[in-house]
């Protein structure tokens, strides 16, 4: 982002009963000359926060679809927004993680900034799905308020030899609720197989 706080702001007007789809959102914002987007070239990855100027967001559903080219077309996954007040406050579990020659698991975290501007610090306990034994704890993961972080190939990086497992994400310091999720990708390494993803919500 080409702003001091790495944030771009824009408005959407939605009438009662209206559905609105914003395809290729970054390009759309660029065409609107939204401050912070800049010229085509850089890759954008991050988190979207939605608020209303008056009232509340009851009755409003927000979702996103992330797409990537592959094979003869494109692959993608869809996920819904997490409502204010519904994020995790102390820990979250992610089940069904995989790391094989055909699949890999990325894990992502969002510091919602709902409480204040403090940084959250996390640890991740990784368990073997075959034995139920904790294999390793990844500590000292820091994330500023209203920021997003993805850990690619979590099992390959931190628990080599674990082909299927699960993880507990814990907030060890900080005041803000957080969101944890995983994406199971087709292909043991980036660039292999289709790269198609399956979204895994936390429990």
List the model feature ranges, each with a label.
Residues 1-203:
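Gly/Pro-rich, tryptophan- and cysteine-flecked surface segments typical
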């Amino acid at each position: 982002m080409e702003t001091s706080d790495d944030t771009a702001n824009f408005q959407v007007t939605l009438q009662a009963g209206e559905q609105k789809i914003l395809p290729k959102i970054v390009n759309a914002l660029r065409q609107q000359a939204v401050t912070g987007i800049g010229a085509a070239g850089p890759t954008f990855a991050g988190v979207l926060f939605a608020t209303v100027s008056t009232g509340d967001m009851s009755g409003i559903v927000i979702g996103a679809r992330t797409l990537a080219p592959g094979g003869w077309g494109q692959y993608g996954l869809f996920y819904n927004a997490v409502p204010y007040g519904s994020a995790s406050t102390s820990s979250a579990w992610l089940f069904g993680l995989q790391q094989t020659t055909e699949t890999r698991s990325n894990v992502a975290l969002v510091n919602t900034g709902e409480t204040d501007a403090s940084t959250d610090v996390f640890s991740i306990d990784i368990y073997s799905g075959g034995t139920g034994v904790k294999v390793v704890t990844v500590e000292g993961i820091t994330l500023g308020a209203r920021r997003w972080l993805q850990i690619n190939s979590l099992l390959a990086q931190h628990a080599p030899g674990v082909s299927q497992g699960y993880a507990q994400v814990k907030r060890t310091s900080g005041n803000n609720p957080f969101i944890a999720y995983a994406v199971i990708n087709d292909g043991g390494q980036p660039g292999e197989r289709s790269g198609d993803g399956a979204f895994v919500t936390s429990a």
